[in-house]
Swiss-Prot record:
Disulfide bonds: none annotated. This is UPF0434 protein Vapar_2640. Belongs to the UPF0434 family. Gene3D superfamilies: 2.20.25.10.
């Protein structure tokens, strides 16, 4: 994930920052508890395409 692009992108639900998970190819929003997929290098920032992050994934 391009770091400059990551600095510009925000969670569409909370408008908060996103973190890159290279292992799962996802952009994660801790505040929304959502992980957005990245397909072919393109972030899919649609709430209905995101999966819910577990407490374990959030480190809770």
């Amino acid at each position: 994930m391009d770091t400059k692009l990551l600095e510009l992108l925000v969670c569409p639900v909370t408008k908060g920052p996103l973190t890159w998970n290279p292992e799962k190819q996802e952009l994660c929003s801790r505040s929304a508890r959502l992980a957005y997929p990245v397909r072919d290098g393109i972030p899919v920032l649609l709430e209905n395409e995101a999966r819910t992050l577990s407490d374990e994934e959030l480190g809770l």
